[in-house]
Curated annotation (Swiss-Prot):
Pfam families associated with the record: Rhodanese
Protein's cellular compartments: Cytoplasm
Annotated EC: 2.8.1.1
Reaction it catalyzes: thiosulfate + hydrogen cyanide = thiocyanate + sulfite + 2 H(+); thiosulfate + [thioredoxin]-dithiol = [thioredoxin]-disulfide + hydrogen sulfide + sulfite + 2 H(+)
PROSITE patterns for the chain: RHODANESE_3 (PS50206)
Protein name from the UniProt record: Thiosulfate sulfurtransferase GlpE
Domain Rhodanese: 17-105
UniProt-recorded Gene Ontology molecular function terms: thiosulfate-cyanide sulfurtransferase activity
Active site: 65
Lineage, opening ranks: Bacteria, Pseudomonadati, Pseudomonadota, Gammaproteobacteria, Enterobacterales
GO CC field: cytoplasm
Family to which this protein belongs: Belongs to the GlpE family.
Keywords of the record: Cytoplasm, Transferase
Organism of origin: Klebsiella pneumoniae (strain 342)
């Protein structure tokens, strides 16, 4: 995959539950703590190294932000770092929360 692919929250939900991709959330720590997708890895400048050590480059990665804009830049960056399959989640956490309100975790873990 030379370019990331945009997917909707339904596709992201399916990939997450089928465990065919991991989800990273790039929002600020306060927004992440107030609510995030269960199982999402909070990807920041400080956690990037750990994420890259813990995941093989052939791991499919879905990137989520607030509304689906910032995730595109982060998705492109992950491709440049060597990840093979990267997706940007259209609509971001805002769309996830609207479509799957019962699937929102709170806190930093």
């Amino acid at each position: 995959m030379e370019q990331f692919e945009c997917i909707n929250v339904e596709e992201a939900h399916q990939k997450l539950h089928q465990q065919t991709a991991v989800l990273v959330d790039i929002r600020d720590p306060q927004s992440y703590a107030m609510g995030h997708t269960p199982g999402a890895f909070h990807l920041t400048n400080d956690t990037l190294g750990a994420f890259m050590r813990d995941h093989d480059f052939d791991t499919a990665v879905m990137v989520m932000c607030y509304h689906g804009n910032s995730s595109k830049g982060a998705a492109q960056y992950l491709l440049q770092q060597g990840f093979d399959k990267v997706y940007s989640v259209d609509g971001g956490f805002d769309a996830w929360h609207r479509h799957f309100p019962a699937e929102v975790a709170h806190g930093t873990f």
